[in-house]
Amino acid sequence: MKKQKRNLLAALALLAALMPVHAQKMSGNPLFPGWYADPEGAVFGNRYWIYPTYSDAYEKQVFMDAFSSRDLIKWKKHDHILDTAAVKWAHKALWAPAIVHKDGRYFLFFAANDIQNDEETGGIGVAVADRPQGPYKDYLGKPLLDKFQNGAQPIDQFVFHDADGQYYMIYGGWRHCNIVRLKADFTGFEPYADGSVFREITPEGYVEGPFMFIRNGKYYFMWSEGGWGGPNYRVAYAIADSPFGPFERIGVVLQQDPAVATGAGHHSLINAPHSDDWYIVYHRRPLTETHHNHRATCMDKLEFDDQGLILPVKITFEGVERNKPLRH
């Protein structure tokens, strides 16, 4: 009898331990604790990854963390995958990571120092590692781009891999956006056929935070509008037949909900492998917070209508459903 009781208690304890795991069917928003912004989403191997900006005073933004998950529910933190100790020319404002896996290595593009003119040191850099969780080290020993071009501040870089294999860097703050052709080894830029290097593709309303993807042969260009420190930060988009546009603004797809959060913006998308399931990863400010740096990383479903237009995203507290664990 005692043995049966012990077995029963053990079974009940095991069931109790497992129940919370099975009961959690939604990710919840925010995805993980802490103030993090400008999230870059990616899929590497059997894990989803998020690379955000650590949201604090510029002088304290001297490192980057990453987060990984197999099912979009449970997220593991990877501390200090990059910090300014590994990038001698960077000393503050490490922002807006963009990640690329190429030739067996992981390239992390980042902005640093928030330069205000061409005389200051900083701009867009590249770090490299053998694993998605790093540690990352400076790839070039200097910025990849440290000058203003077409009025665009060298920040908020996104690396776009086109269908023909070409890699582009789309970037820019101060209401201007450029697209440049990256060299195959990411050490610099290649000129276009006309000899130019920087092509401006700024759409109406653009402020910062560009993102591009292809779906059904169309190029979707997304960006953030408004001030990042205020409640009206938002995401708009356009569609074109080329990565060079022209991009005519269609409308807003992500914005605040007075019942949920404010300042929803600076996003990226994750397309679940082998599916047409899309998730928007973004930051927002909880209703309880007013400090501009109190931004949290969240995820919600992104969907399209029959014409391929993006449906307005409903920001939620629930987040997204558990995804089938990824396998290699």
Q: Which residues are covered by each model-predicted region?
A:
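Bacterial Sec-dependent N-terminal signal peptides
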Residues: 1-25
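Carbohydrate-active catalytic/glycan-binding domains of CAZyme proteins
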Residues: 23-328
